[in-house]
């Protein structure tokens, strides 16, 4: 197994102190952006309104393996807002966990959105969209209010302007910054 990457160490002012590879190469944050994306859920009041637990917030902030306990957390998040997995637009997937995948295959179950490693993040975005009274079918759209809020948060956390963000759409239908 081979991995490729770059290392950049910078001080608080952004001065490069050490690097391995090109320190100015554009890199998409992908799942590393999930904690920043979850800030929108926290700021929306959805945590309090729907009684979201720390465990449920944690699955919104990270990728998961699609194991039964993780899938149950995502189902609970959705259920607290009166939603179900049909609202998720993260794409269908088998679990990353080989054991969970084998069990689904043994039972003849197809891949589904709950087992997608990003379903927790998507559940959080749905809660944010719902509490703001937004169209739940549009939450992953780049120009949706949910995504605009997230972009503002990322700019604030990273100390950059919107014009400095780069966007792409991946196989999960959601933009990554």
PLM region spans:
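Active-site SXXK
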Residues: 29-47
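Generic secondary-structure signature for well-ordered alpha-helical cores
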Residues: 12-15, 46-47, 79-83, 131, ...
């Amino acid at each position: 197994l081979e991995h490729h990457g770059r290392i950049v160490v910078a001080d608080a002012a952004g001065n490069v102190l050490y690097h391995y590879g090109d320190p100015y190469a554009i890199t998409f944050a992908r799942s590393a952006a999930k904690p920043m994306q979850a800030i929108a859920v926290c700021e929306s009041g959805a945590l309090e309104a729907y009684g979201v637990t720390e465990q449920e917030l944690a699955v919104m902030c990270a990728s998961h393996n699609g194991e039964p306990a993780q899938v149950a957390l995502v189902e609970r998040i959705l259920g607290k807002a009166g939603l179900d997995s049909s609202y998720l637009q993260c794409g269908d997937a088998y679990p990353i966990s080989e054991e969970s995948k084998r069990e689904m295959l043994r039972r003849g179950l197809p891949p589904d959105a709950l087992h997608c490693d990003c379903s927790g993040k998507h559940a959080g975005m749905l809660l944010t969209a719902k509490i703001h009274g937004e169209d739940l079918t549009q939450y992953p759209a780049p120009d949706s209010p949910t995504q605009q809020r997230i972009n503002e948060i990322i700019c604030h956390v990273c100390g950059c302007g919107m014009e400095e963000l780069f966007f792409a759409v991946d196989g999960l239908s959601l933009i990554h910054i």
